Amino acid sequence: MKYLVRIAYLGEQFYGFQYQPGRRTVQGELNRVCESVFGGVCRVTGCSRTDRGVSARDFCITVEPPAGGVRIPAKRLPLAALPYLPRDLVFLSAKTVPDSFHPRYDVKTKEYRYSIRCSPTPDPFLSGQVWEYPVTLPKNALPRMRAAAVHFLGKHDFAAFMAQGSDVKDTTRTIFGMKVLKKGKLITVSVTGDGFLYNMVRIIAGTLLDVGAGKLEPDDIPQIIASKERKRAGVTAPPEGLSLWKVTY
């Protein structure tokens, strides 16, 4: 039996998703929780490898219980896990899937959202969930950022928006949708695609902020993409503003 479980977590107190001995990770907590629920060691596989400090509102995992372990109806799994879960991690829903299903390789789309709060003073209630950018942007920042965002749509080689040192050979990805939203002091960049390179969304967010601040022009984006050079794009935004928002299969 294999379960597909949708989870949510705050990334501030985690060293990323992937298990690391001696460090608190999402996968490490899931291993502990699932072992308690099913009475034995489970195989837990994630849809992505989020970095330290990155959160998720809709992260998908598969759980494969041990042979001979406790059998739990899928709809009851979130409540069965609740007593063992920490406060910054929750099971949202669960269902059974075929043994051939893979939570990472069967993904059709992922939506990430990056949140930037532009203010000289931070908001303690948003600590660990936004990039606190201590500069007030120009009044024309939002239309400039939206104009730049259009250039990311479609299928492109996004090598310029990948962290240096990554060993990925195929750097072509497709962006299906992109929005730049503003509410009060909070700017949110929403990006939906078929997959993302290492730090890609954070570099896109940093680049859009540079456009909003006047350090880059909206029409610079096609040239940056074509260059395939990381140094041409903007800064890598910090991890705390990033959330995996939605995964579809």
Model-assigned labels for residue ranges:
Residues 1-249:
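Structured-RNA-binding interfaces characteristic of tRNA pseudouridine synthases
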